[in-house]
Amino acid sequence: MTRKQMELLDFIKTRMDRDGVPPSFDEMKDALDLRSKSGIHRLITALEERGFIRRLAHRARAIEIVKLPEAMERAGFSARAAKAAAAPLPKGAVTVETAGALDLPLMGRIAAGLPIEAINGGPQSVTVPGMMLSGRGQHYALEVKGDSMIAAGINDGDIVVIREQQTADNGDIVVALVADHEATLKRYRRRGGMIALEPANDSYETQVYPEQMVKVQGRLVGLIRSY
């Protein structure tokens, strides 16, 4: 097993253990510092051929860990069949009623111009599937206003579930507070001493700020959409 294969398998199992779903190919590429996703495809194929993982057809982010190298087993990780759930449309969706529903505070809309503290809408709450929550830390919900993240599957009017935290990994979608007065939902990238907040819509430009101007307020862990 090559070093890169080991690194990728370790990253996949760490993210699945933390989030319950595999990372995206973009997240894998960034984690391994590769220039393109083709390298990730080759590593995934090699891991599958060696029997460490299994890809499930016609499902987004559908990777199942089958076994681990002895070195990882000795480190204390128990290989488990952790995989993304599938449903007709959208992929991975579940009904609130079947997922151990919990109430979270709905703090308002995530839109440019207001920090999280200022958009607290009072005692409103929203019911979310318990499986979205990590079991540790505080969570809250926000209503999305705008279309800057549509390519990431986040639409205007969606409810996003956020886990409160002050740090983020490259590629995470976060609530970021800029210059202590503007909150935004964007993909987080560290570039040396700068922080890039990337939209998922070509109509918007990436925002780049000095590190000290950006405070992570939380990380996206789930999304709720009404039809």
From Swiss-Prot:
Xref: InterPro entries: LexA, LexA-like, LexA/Signal_pep-like_sf, LexA_DNA-bd_dom, LexA_repressor, Peptidase_S24_LexA, Peptidase_S24_S26A/B/C, WH-like_DNA-bd_sf
Signal peptide start-end: none
EC number: 3.4.21.88
Superkingdom per UniProt: Bacteria
GO biological process: DNA repair; DNA replication; negative regulation of DNA-templated transcription; proteolysis; SOS response
Keywords: Autocatalytic cleavage, DNA damage, DNA repair, DNA replication, DNA-binding, Hydrolase, Repressor, SOS response, Transcription, Transcription regulation
SUPFAM superfamilies (alphabetical): LexA/Signal peptidase, Winged helix' DNA-binding domain
Pfam families: LexA_DNA_bind, Peptidase_S24
Catalytic residue list: 148, 186
Site for Cleavage, residues: 112-113
Reaction equations catalysed: Hydrolysis of Ala-|-Gly bond in repressor LexA
Enzyme superclass (EC): hydrolase
MF terms (GO), sorted A to Z: DNA binding; serine-type endopeptidase activity
DNA-binding region positions on the chain: 25-45
HAMAP family: LexA (MF_00015)
NCBIfam families: lexA
Family: Belongs to the peptidase S24 family.
Subunit note: Homodimer.
The protein's role, per its UniProt record: Represses a number of genes involved in the response to DNA damage (SOS response), including recA and lexA. In the presence of single-stranded DNA, RecA interacts with LexA causing an autocatalytic cleavage which disrupts the DNA-binding part of LexA, leading to derepression of the SOS regulon and eventually DNA repair.
Protein name: LexA repressor
